[in-house]
Regions:
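Metal- or metallocofactor-binding catalytic centers and their adjacent structured scaffolds
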Residues: 1-59
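N-terminal small/glycine-rich loop or linker at the start of catalytic domains
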Residues: 59-85, 119, 128
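Short, acidic/polar
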Residues: 85-97, 144-148
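Catalytic domains of carbohydrate-active enzymes, especially glycoside hydrolases
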Residues: 96-108
Length: 171
């Protein structure tokens, strides 16, 4: 199943017959049933799981956040993605996003490791105290490239997100 909207619809058609008559309040057994009926494809199962949490909340007359342990706070901090461009342009964008109220910046990388190193360093130079920088490679690096980038930016306060295709490659 491809990981896009048609894939979700196909997956739900595949799962549907297995779910009819199941209790949506029993999430553990329901998730195990979905895993048995369709291996992988969490993007198909997630909307079903979310809908079941919504049903649980309505039955309990509680917001889902209370079912999950309580509200963490009154709001949460959003991040702003910075699209892949020339490193200097990406760094310049930080100030305009900061002016819009953002304090978390997700830098899109995952192309040429040499250019990505420059992207990370130039954008990091614009980050102020209290702000966060994430470099999201969207699985675009091979393992040796990810290791090289991480070594090159070891002195930079940056989270590296999804560097490689598989979990094992990221270890």
């Amino acid at each position: 199943l491809p990981a896009y909207a048609d894939g979700v619809r196909s997956g739900i058609r595949e799962l549907g017959p297995h779910l009819i008559g199941q209790d949506p309040l029993l999430l553990g057994p329901l998730n195990r049933l979905m895993d048995k009926a369709l291996r992988g494809h969490p993007y198909v199962k997630s909307p079903i799981d979310i809908a079941c949490w919504d049903i649980k909340g309505k039955v309990a007359k509680l917001p889902v956040c209370e079912l999950l342990g309580g509200r963490y706070g009154d709001d949460f901090v959003l991040y702003r993605a910075i699209s892949q461009q020339d490193p200097a342009e990406m760094a310049t964008n930080v100030q305009s996003y900061r002016d819009q109220g953002y304090r978390r910046f997700q830098l899109k990388v995952g192309g040429d490791p040499n250019v990505d190193i420059e992207r990370i360093k130039q954008v990091a130079a614009q980050i102020q105290p209290g702000e966060k920088l994430i470099a999201d490679a969207n699985t675009g690096w091979l393992m040796h490239e990810a290791a090289r980038v991480c070594r090159a930016v070891a002195d930079v306060d940056v989270y590296i997100e999804q560097p490689c295709l598989t979990y094992e490659e990221c270890l």
